C-alpha cells in the first residue's frame, strides 16, 4: 500500500511539472532566400535554457511557465527577441543579415576596407579577443593566436623583450621584427642602454609601454600585397595597432582591477650536499687513478694545519652534509619566490555626431619570480576628435608612459642567476662571498646576485598622432597626419663587493647609461572612394610621407668605490672612472606612394600598390628604390552556381605578388667612421683623423635587402559562417642580404658591410574558427591555427658562423641549403 501511494504521488508530480512548461517548436530561415539557418541559437529569456536549430533549421525548446520571450541569434544575423502569445506552441522565424558584421571594417596600410573586399593576407584581432588572457603587453596577447606569426619571449622576466617573426626570418644580421604602426604612425624605440659589460643580454620590450586595454584592434599584414605600401620597411611584415575611440551613446566610465600570482610550476631535481660531495670525491679519485694525476680529494672529512695561521682547519666530508653538521643548499629555493601582480584601469569615453573622446589611465605592478625583480608601469592616453565643420575634422591621440624595470641577471652569458641556481655547488654557504666554490667563470652565487646587484631601467615615452581631415566633396578626403614620439631610457647599474664584477680589486662596479630617440612623421594623403552603377567600386589612395629620426646616447663606467652604501649615486667617489662615451645620429626617409582597389560586381577584386622610398642611410646612386605589388581575388560564393550548391556561405580565392625592402642598417653604414689619431710626419707626431678599423671601410655600393613574395589563399565559410576556414600558401625570397664579409687585413680592416646571400621562406597557414553559441549574454567559440615554414639559405660563397661571441651565437652555422639558426656541434 505504501509503495502504491509513492507511485501515485510521483505520477502526479510528473504531470504537474509537465504542466509548468510548454514545448515550442518551429523553423528558423534566412529572410533573403528562405534557406534553413543551421545551428541558430534559441534561448528562453530569464530561464537559462535553450536549443540549437538542426540541419533543417528546426528547433524545439522547453519554455517554463511564466516565461514568454525567446531570443534568436545566429552568426552574421541580427538578434531577435520575440514574445510568445498565450498558448502558442509553434513559432517560425526569419532572420535578417547583420550588415555591420558582414561588412566588418579592417584597417590596412593608409586606410581601411571591408573584410569581404580584402585581396591580401590580413589577420585581425579585436579588443575582446586580445584581452581574454589579460596580457601585460601586446606581444603576449598575440601568442598562439595567428597562423604564421611566431611570438618568442627572449627572457621570462617582467617587461623583458619579446620578438615577433612573421612567416620566418628573412635576414642574418639585420632585425627581423615587423614594422609597428600605431594609429597610422610608425612606432619606434631607442632600445636598451648598455652596461659596459660583455655578456649581459637583458632586453626590454618597447611595446610594453602600450596598455593592451587601450587597443581597439590589431591587424597583421603578412603578404606583399598588403605590406608593399610600406616599402623599404615592410619585408618583415607589418603590425597595425588601432587604439580605442569613444563609444556611441552616453558617456561611459569603466574601471577594472586585475590581480595575479606567478610561481615556478616545477623545479628541477638537484643533488643535495651529500650527493654532490660524493660525486666530486669520486671524480677526483677516478681522475687520479686513470690519468695518473695527483688531485686533492675536495671533501675529505679530515683536519689539517693551515701553514699561514698555524691553526687546524677541518674540511668537511659527505657525511657532514648528510647528518646536517654542514648545511646543504638548494639554490632554486633561495632564488625563486611567489610573485604577485596587480593592474588597475580607468577609462572615460563618449561620442556623438560632432566627435568623440576617450581618456584612460593604467597602473601596473608586476613582481618577478626571481627575488628583487619586477616591472612597474604608469600610462595615460587621450584620444580626441571634433568636427569643427561639416567638411573638416581635427583630432589628436596622445599617450605618456613611465616605467621602471628591475632587471635580474637572467639573460646573461656569464654569472647568470638561473645558471647559478643550477650549477653552483650545493655545499657552498648561502652567503658565500669568496667565489672559491665557483665552478668556472660562467657560474657564481645566485643568492648574492639577487641581494647585492642593482640593475634598473627607467623609461619615459611620449607618443602623439594628430590629424586634420578635409572633405572637399563627397567622394574625396584629404588628410594631414603629424606624428611625434620621444623616448628616453636610463639604466643604473651597481655591483658591490660581494659580486664577481665588484669584488676586490675592482671594489664596486658602477655604470650609468642612457639613450634617447625622437621621431617626426609628416604625411599628406588623399583618398578617393567612388561607386559607379552599383557594379563598380573604386578606392584610390595617394600620399607623400617624410620621416626624420634623431637619436643619441651617453654612458659612464667607474670602479674603485670607498664603500658600497652610495652605489652609483656618487660616481665622483670612484677612484677609477673610465672615459665617458657618447653618440649622436640622424636618419630621414622620404616616400611617394599610391594604391588602387577595384571591385567589380562585388565578385572580382583587384589591388595594386606602388611606393618609392629614398633613405639617407644609403649613398648616392642607391638612396632610392621602388616597391610594387598586385593582387586579385574572386568571391566565388557570389556566383549563382556556387549558391546553388548550398554548401558555402563564403568562398573567396586570393592571389598576390609584391616586393618589399629592408633598410635596417646603421645611419652611417655607407660612410667612413673617423676618430682622432696621431701620425708621424717629418719626424714628428701630428694630430689628424683616421678610420676606426673595427667598423670596416665605407661601402658606397650598399643597397636595400629586397624580399619578393608570392601568396595564394582561400577563405571559406560554412553554415552561415558559423564555421570559417582560411588557408594560405606562400613563397618569399630575400636577396642582397646586408651582412659583414671578411676582407684581407692588408687593407687595414678585417671586415666590411656588403650585400650578398639569399634566404627563402615557404610555408602553409591554416586558420579555423567555430562559433558554437552566439548571443547577447553568452558567446562560445573555438579558434585553432597551424602553420608550417621552411627556411633555407643560399648564395653564400662558403660556410660562415653567426657573429657576436658575447651573445653566445657563434655556434650557429650559416650554410647553403640549411636554415637560419642551424647549430654546429662536435
Residue positions per predicted region:
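Short acidic/polar hinge/loop motifs at secondary-structure boundaries
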Residues: 59-62, 185-222
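Short, glycine-/polar-rich solvent-exposed loops and beta-turns at beta-strand/coil boundaries
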Residues: 55, 83-88, 152-160, 212, ...
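Residues embedded in well-ordered regular secondary structure
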Residues: 145, 157-162, 172-179, 187-204, ...
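Extracytoplasmic beta-strand/coil segments of soluble accessory domains associated
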Residues: 60-62, 140-189, 217, 227-244
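Extracellular/periplasmic, surface-exposed regions of secreted and cell-surface proteins
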Residues: 130, 177, 342, 377, ...
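N-terminal periplasmic "start-of-domain" segments of outer-membrane beta-barrel proteins
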Residues: 41-58, 106-131, 159-163, 191-201, ...
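Periplasm-facing N-terminal accessory domains of Gram-negative outer-membrane beta-barrel systems
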Residues: 7, 14-104
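Short, polar/charged loop or turn motifs at beta-strand boundaries
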Residues: 28-31, 121-144, 152-156, 165-171, ...
Amino acid at each position: 500500500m505504501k509503495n502504491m501511494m509513492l507511485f501515485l504521488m510521483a505520477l502526479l508530480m510528473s504531470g504537474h511539472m509537465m504542466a509548468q512548461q510548454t514545448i515550442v517548436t518551429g523553423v528558423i530561415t534566412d529572410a533573403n532566400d528562405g534557406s534553413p539557418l543551421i545551428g541558430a541559437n534559441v534561448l528562453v529569456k530569464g530561464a537559462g535554457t535553450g536549443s540549437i536549430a538542426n540541419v533543417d533549421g528546426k528547433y524545439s525548446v522547453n519554455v517554463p511557465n511564466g516565461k514568454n520571450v525567446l531570443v534568436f541569434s545566429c552568426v552574421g544575423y541580427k538578434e531577435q527577441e520575440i514574445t510568445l502569445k498565450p498558448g502558442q506552441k509553434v513559432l517560425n522565424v526569419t532572420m535578417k543579415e547583420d550588415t555591420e558584421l558582414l561588412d566588418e571594417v579592417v584597417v590596412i596600410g593608409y586606410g581601411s576596407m571591408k573584410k569581404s573586399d580584402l585581396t591580401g593576407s590580413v589577420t585581425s584581432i579585436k579588443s575582446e579577443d586580445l584581452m581574454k588572457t589579460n596580457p601585460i603587453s601586446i606581444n603576449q596577447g598575440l601568442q598562439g593566436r595567428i597562423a604564421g606569426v611566431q611570438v618568442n619571449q627572449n627572457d621570462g622576466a617582467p617587461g623583458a623583450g619579446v620578438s615577433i617573426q612573421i612567416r620566418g626570418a628573412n635576414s642574418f644580421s639585420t632585425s627581423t621584427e615587423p614594422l609597428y604602426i600605431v594609429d597610422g604612425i610608425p612606432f619606434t624605440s631607442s632600445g636598451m642602454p648598455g652596461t659596459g659589460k660583455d655578456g649581459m643580454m637583458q632586453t626590454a620590450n618597447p611595446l610594453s609601454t602600450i596598455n593592451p586595454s587601450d587597443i581597439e584592434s590589431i591587424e597583421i599584414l603578412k603578404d606583399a600585397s598588403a605590406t608593399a605600401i610600406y616599402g623599404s620597411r615592410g619585408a618583415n611584415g607589418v603590425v597595425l595597432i588601432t587604439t580605442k575611440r569613444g563609444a556611441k551613446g552616453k558617456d561611459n566610465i569603466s574601471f577594472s582591477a586585475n590581480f595575479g600570482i606567478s610561481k615556478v610550476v616545477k623545479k628541477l631535481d638537484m643533488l643535495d650536499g651529500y650527493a654532490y660531495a660524493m660525486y666530486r670525491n669520486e671524480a677526483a679519485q677516478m681522475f687520479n687513478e686513470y690519468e695518473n694525476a695527483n688531485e686533492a680529494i675536495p671533501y675529505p672529512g679530515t683536519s689539517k694545519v693551515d701553514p699561514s695561521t698555524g691553526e687546524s682547519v677541518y674540511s668537511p666530508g659527505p657525511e657532514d652534509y648528510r647528518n646536517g653538521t654542514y648545511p646543504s643548499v638548494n639554490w632554486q629555493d633561495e632564488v625563486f619566490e611567489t610573485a604577485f601582480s596587480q593592474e588597475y584601469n580607468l577609462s572615460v569615453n563618449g561620442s556623438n555626431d560632432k566627435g568623440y573622446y576617450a581618456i584612460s589611465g593604467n597602473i601596473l605592478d608586476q613582481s618577478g619570480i626571481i627575488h628583487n625583480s619586477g616591472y612597474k608601469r604608469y600610462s595615460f592616453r587621450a584620444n580626441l576628435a571634433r568636427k569643427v565643420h561639416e567638411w573638416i575634422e581635427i583630432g589628436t591621440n596622445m599617450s605618456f608612459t613611465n616605467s621602471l624595470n628591475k632587471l635580474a641577471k637572467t639573460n646573461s652569458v656569464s654569472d647568470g642567476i638561473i645558471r647559478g641556481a643550477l650549477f653552483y655547488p650545493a655545499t657552498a654557504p648561502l652567503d658565500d662571498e669568496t667565489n672559491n666554490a665557483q665552478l668556472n667563470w660562467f657560474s657564481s652565487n645566485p643568492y648574492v646576485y639577487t641581494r647585492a646587484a642593482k640593475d634598473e631601467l627607467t623609461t619615459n615615452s611620449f607618443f602623439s598622432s594628430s590629424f586634420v581631415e578635409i572633405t572637399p566633396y563627397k567622394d574625396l578626403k584629404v588628410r594631414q597626419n603629424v606624428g611625434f614620439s620621444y623616448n628616453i631610457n636610463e639604466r643604473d647599474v651597481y655591483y658591490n663587493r660581494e659580486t664577481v664584477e665588484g669584488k676586490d680589486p675592482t671594489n664596486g662596479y658602477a655604470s650609468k647609461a642612457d639613450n634617447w630617440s625622437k621621431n617626426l612623421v609628416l604625411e599628406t594623403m588623399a583618398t578617393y572612394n567612388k561607386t559607379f552603377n552599383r557594379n563598380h567600386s573604386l578606392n584610390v589612395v595617394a600620399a607623400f610621407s617624410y620621416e626624420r629620426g634623431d637619436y643619441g646616447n651617453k654612458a659612464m663606467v667607474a670602479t674603485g668605490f670607498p664603500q658600497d652604501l652610495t652605489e652609483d649615486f656618487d660616481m665622483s667617489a670612484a677612484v677609477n672612472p673610465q672615459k665617458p662615451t657618447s653618440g649622436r645620429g640622424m636618419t630621414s626617409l622620404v616616400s611617394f606612394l599610391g594604391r588602387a582597389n577595384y571591385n567589380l560586381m562585388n565578385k572580382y577584386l583587384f589591388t595594386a600598390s606602388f611606393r618609392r622610398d629614398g633613405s639617407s642611410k644609403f649613398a648616392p646612386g642607391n638612396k632610392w628604390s621602388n616597391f610594387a605589388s598586385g593582387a586579385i581575388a574572386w568571391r566565388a560564393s557570389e556566383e549563382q552556381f556556387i549558391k546553388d550548391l548550398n554548401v558555402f556561405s563564403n568562398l573567396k580565392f586570393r592571389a598576390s605578388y609584391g616586393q618589399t625592402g629592408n633598410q635596417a642598417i646603421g645611419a652611417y653604414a655607407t660612410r667612413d667612421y673617423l676618430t682622432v689619431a696621431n701620425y708621424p710626419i717629418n719626424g714628428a707626431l701630428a694630430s689628424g683623423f683616421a678610420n676606426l678599423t673595427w667598423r670596416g671601410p665605407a661601402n658606397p655600393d650598399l643597397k636595400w635587402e629586397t624580399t619578393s613574395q608570392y601568396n595564394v589563399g582561400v577563405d571559406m565559410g560554412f553554415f552561415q559562417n558559423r564555421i570559417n576556414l582560411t588557408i594560405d600558401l606562400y613563397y618569399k625570397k630575400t636577396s642582397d642580404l646586408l651582412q659583414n664579409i671578411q676582407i684581407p687585413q692588408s687593407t687595414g680592416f678585417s671586415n666590411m658591410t656588403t650585400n650578398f646571400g639569399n634566404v627563402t621562406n615557404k610555408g602553409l597557414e591554416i586558420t579555423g574558427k567555430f562559433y558554437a553559441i552566439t548571443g547577447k549574454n553568452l558567446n562560445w567559440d573555438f579558434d585553432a591555427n597551424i602553420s608550417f615554414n621552411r627556411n633555407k639559405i643560399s648564395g653564400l660563397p662558403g660556410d660562415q658562423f653567426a657573429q657576436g661571441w658575447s651573445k653566445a651565437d657563434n655556434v650557429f652555422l650559416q650554410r647553403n641549403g640549411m636554415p637560419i639558426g642551424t647549430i654546429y656541434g662536435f
